[in-house]
Amino acid sequence: MKLAEKLAAMSNEQATKEEVVTNEIVNFFVEKFETGEMMDAFEKSLGKQEICLRKKSIYLEFWIYVPGCFGTYFGLLGKEWKPENDHDYEHKGVNLKNIYKDVLHEIAELTKENFEEEGFEVKILPNEKNKRFETYVIEISW
């Protein structure tokens, strides 16, 4: 076990339930960036017009369960983290409605850092158009 992993495990033992769940969700996206899945998904999502404009907007979302439609999840570039029961608002005893803003903020910052490391310019904006669920628009330009 690497030292960072050992220390993370020790920290998680001391963390609150909310911190543990927040870390689990954010680490899901950390792993997707580390394996290159996010950059691959971004590249595949580009159309001719976006390439010409040198800009693409992606969406970081928190969906709340809607009966008959969608389950609860955090999503970015087609990658979705879902709780134990995606027809619920809780994961490991934590109400996701109480932590989603912190989780979205951390994922947005993670996204910004990773795209900037690849040489992109990044702006993070709240999505004012969609009132049904929480969304950030992340503008990526090159």
Predicted regions and their residues:
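C-terminal edge-of-domain segments
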Residues: 114-142
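Short amphipathic alpha-helix segments
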Residues: 108-113
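N-terminal leader/targeting segments
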Residues: 1-105
